[in-house]
Regions:
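Glycine-rich cofactor-pocket loops
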Residues: 28-31, 61-73, 284-299, 313-352, ...
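C-terminal amphipathic alpha-helical interaction region
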Residues: 98, 456, 472-596
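Acidic, low-complexity proline/glycine-rich segments
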Residues: 1-24, 274-283, 314, 320-321, ...
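Alpha-helix capping/hinge segments and adjacent helical runs
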Residues: 181, 258, 364, 386-464, ...
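Amphipathic, small/basic residue-rich leader segments at the start of a protein or domain
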Residues: 1-123, 147, 578-596
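A short core secondary-structure module
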Residues: 186-244
Length: 596
């Protein structure tokens, strides 16, 4: 199936909700306003629709392959990757001083959504490279930045993130890979890393692995982990590639989805030690890796949004073609396309509402990141960075849970045909399943939301956002119509529910952590439901204000916002009850280990 990027919807969010014109007033972004965004998004849509989308099914049916340590990408991926990097897409949001485009994250984010929607397996490669670039720009030496970043931006080299080991999944305190210092300032790295996305492939000349390992006599646990650059090929003084480093791919995984993305098992040091270069200071590796991880977590949230939109497009197209049964209201005597049936409309409306809400929240988060990095006032930068950091686990956790629901509904709209691989709906369902797992499971995102993002600041950011929601509720009260009334009622209830849960977390987080963390995922889901609902409410307000300019488009925005209010926001009260009303989640903690 073809992919038609929803550029008009994206531009609506950029202008009306995320504030592209405000971002364009930041130092260095003066030329990156609405017109620039429109031009970039149009080109991205063309590339993703014409080049990447046709390869999506091919990658699923003819995935990357491994033989004797060599990984060969799906046919067509290499040529597509060359077009991608030659078009400057890898460097879209990276600094011009390293040959990037220097555009705001706010403009890059819709392009990333398109990449994910058109071909998720392909999009994973530039995602990890983006993370490597961010980590090196933040923690690398000037020499490391000059040596690696331009090549990563140009796409001549790609990047990876090496955390996981057979015994160390989410618990990085268990990392055993070791790095032994040499007399020349380098280290020899030894160990096994698993689940390394695009850890070996033939699409680029070199691969820059960022590897967590322990130096001799390092402290126990996460405080004794350091970060190292380990290139696949050594780099000569003149920048040319030298001998193969002692890192080898011993296998790739056979997966439920994202089959074209090679998930590698990498062995370091089987032949004397892989040469590595310390990033920053010893024992601060996890701190530096979190730079990469936070970039990746936001990116995975965008994967959820992209795949959700693709699943929605597929389901809507099928519903307009599939003829089954007469309408229940008797308006026709013959069978009609299934989009005429109320429950199909409910499923499609829910899919679209969830996707548009998640998209809006993610784009707004991207704008906060841009302001945090570029605003001239330090206090403003700090405030927007805090908001962005609060939103990241919600964007990652909520969007990736959401896409599992949306992709499942997409299969359901297809009926029995959705269970057949040839129709394509099943691929989105399979591809989506990993998104709530990798780069930190939903529970890890929820724990972050509770611990670092709510308890640590006394709920300051959460309460500030809830106050802003109150302003939106007040604005809704000035509008006529059923949609505004419904949204006002549900958003007001949702804000009260979120406020209640934040207060509960603050009151019980230290004295009864088991109870609070048993409700952490419902808290994250509640935050997602309410914060996305807030953005849908703002979309409704903007649609009312602009309705005369494009009645059909803005009426659809109003209707989808009402759908969100009545089918998604209504869940807020139940989520609150499952946390606050569950008496410390006694039922969750009641069974003994043997009773499970």
């Amino acid at each position: 199936m073809s992919y038609n990027a929803p550029v008009k919807d994206m531009l609506f969010v950029l202008k009306e909700l995320a504030g592209i014109d405000t971002v364009a007033q930041l130092p260095g972004f003066e030329e990156a306003g609405y017109d620039t965004a429109q031009a970039v998004l149009d080109e991205s849509a063309k590339f993703c629709g014409e080049v990447l989308a046709p390869l999506n099914v091919e990658g699923d049916r003819n995935p990357s392959s491994w033989k004797d340590g060599v990984v060969t990408a799906t046919p067509g991926f290499g040529a597509a990757f060359r077009q991608f990097v030659e078009g400057g897409w890898q460097g879209l949001q990276h600094p011009t001083e390293y040959d990037g485009q220097g555009l705001p994250k706010l403009i890059a984010t819709p392009c990333i959504e398109m990449l994910n929607a058109s071909n998720l397996s392909f999009a994973l490669c530039p995602l990890l490279t983006d993370g490597a670039i961010e980590a090196l720009l933040t923690a690398g030496t000037d020499e490391q930045k000059q040596r690696y970043v331009p090549k990563l931006i140009s796409g001549e080299w790609t990047g990876t993130m090496n955390l996981t080991e057979p015994q160390a999944g989410s618990d990085l305190a268990q990392v055993r890979s070791r790095a032994e210092p040499q007399g020349d300032g380098t280290y020899k790295v030894f160990g096994t890393k698993i689940f390394i996305t695009w850890g070996e492939h033939d699409m680029a000349d070199n691969i820059v692995h960022l590897v967590l390992a322990r130096t001799p006599n390092a402290p126990e646990g996460v405080k004794g982990i350091s970060l190292f650059i380990v290139p696949k090929f050594m780099i000569n003084d003149d920048g040319s590639l030298g001998a193969r480093n002692d890192v080898h791919c011993v296998s790739i995984e056979h997966k439920l989805g994202i089959k074209a993305s090679p998930t590698a098992v990498l062995q370091y040091g089987d032949h004397g030690g892989a040469i590595g270069y310390l990033v920053g200071e010893e024992n601060r590796g996890l701190e530096y890796m979190f730079i990469m991880m936070n970039a990746a977590r936001f990116g995975v949230g965008m994967q959820g949004i992209g795949v959700a939109d693709r699943a929605y497009q597929k389901a809507a197209a099928f519903a307009k073609e599939r003829v089954q049964s007469r309408p229940v209201d008797g308006s026709a005597k013959q069978s009609v396309t299934i989009i005429h049936h109320p429950d199909v409309r409910r499923m499609l409306g829910t899919m679209r509402a969830l996707t548009e809400g998640a998209r809006a929240l993610a784009y707004v988060a991207a704008a906060h990141s841009d302001i945090a990095h570029r605003h001239s006032d330090e206090a403003t930068r700090v405030r927007h960075q805090a908001i962005y950091e609060y939103l990241v686990p919600v964007v990652k956790g909520w969007s990736t849970e959401m896409v599992n629901d949306v992709a499942s509904l997409g299969v359901q709209v297809h009926g029995g045909m959705g269970f057949i691989e040839e129709t394509g709906a099943a691929q989105y369902y399979r591809d989506a399943r990993i998104l709530a797992i990798y780069e930190g499971t939903t529970a890890i995102q929820a724990n972050d939301l509770v611990g670092r993002k709510t308890l640590r600041d006394g709920g300051a950011v959460a309460k500030a956002l809830i106050a802003e929601i109150g302003d939106t509720v007040a604005a809704l009260g000035k509008l006529d119509g059923a949609a505004a009334a419904s949204m006002k009622a549900q958003l007001e209830m949702g804000a009260r529910a979120l406020s209640s849960v934040v207060d509960y977390v603050l009151a019980n987080g230290k004295q009864d952590p088991n109870a609070v963390f048993a409700g952490s995922v419902p808290y994250l889901k509640l935050a997602g439901v309410v914060l996305c609902g807030w953005q849908m409410a703002r979309a409704l307000l903007a649609a009312h204000a602009n309705r005369a300019h494009d009645t059909a488009f803005y009426d659809a925005k109003i209707a989808i916002a009402q759908c969100y209010a009545e089918h998604v926001l209504v869940q807020a009260g139940a989520l609150e009850a499952s946390i606050v009303g569950a008496k410390g989640n006694e039922s969750v903690l009641a069974l003994t280990e043997d009773q499970f």
